[in-house]
A protein has these predicted regions:
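N-terminal amphipathic alpha-helix/helix-capping segment at the start of soluble metabolic enzymes
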Residues: 1-20, 94
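Active-site acidic carboxylates
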Residues: 9-12, 28, 41, 55-60
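Short coil/turn connectors at secondary-structure junctions
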Residues: 14-17, 44-46, 104
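Hydrophobic faces of well-ordered beta-strands that scaffold small-molecule active sites
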Residues: 19-23, 49-51, 108-111
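Active-site beta-loop-alpha junctions enriched in small/polar residues
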Residues: 24-26, 54-56, 113-115
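Short, acidic/polar
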Residues: 30-41, 113-118
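Glycine-rich, proline-tolerant flexible connector loops at the mouths of alpha/beta enzymes
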Residues: 47-86
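Active-site beta->alpha loop and helix N-cap motifs at the rims of alpha/beta catalytic domains
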Residues: 74-120
Length: 120
């Protein structure tokens, strides 16, 4: 594999591995928990943290039931939309997270799930 460049880090051949800490939605929609997870990733030596960016109502139907594994872990008293809404971070939250990452000198990445969050 040839060399790859992510920000100022060049990977491949004799260079070190670029480590991405996948936070995803494990912050449970809590910005303070997200910041603590960034701290943990930084302390563990990660080069980047990766989140998931989405608008729940653009991701699933309001009639969609939760998948079996979701029901097993979080119960059946809400729809998939209601569950995902709790995991959503606002655009303002993303900016706070991005700025926090810059201060910590750790790269911010996010996987967008819709066009609106990809543009932001």
């Amino acid at each position: 594999m040839g060399k790859q460049k992510i920000n100022a880090v060049v990977n491949g051949e004799s260079n070190s591995t670029y480590i991405i800490a996948e936070i995803g939605v494990n912050h449970n929609g809590d910005i303070n928990l997200a910041l603590k997870m960034i701290d943990a990733a930084y302390e563990a030596g990660a080069d980047a943290v990766k989140f998931q960016s989405f608008k729940s109502d653009k991701l699933v139907s309001r009639f969609a039931e939760k998948a079996k594994y979701q029901q097993d872990h979080t119960g059946t008293n809400e729809t998939q939309l209601e569950m995902l809404k709790k995991l959503e971070l606002s655009p303002e939250d993303h900016l706070i997270i991005k700025e926090y990452c810059a201060k910590k000198n750790i790269d911010f990445l996010s996987t967008p799930f819709d066009e609106e969050t990809a543009i932001f």
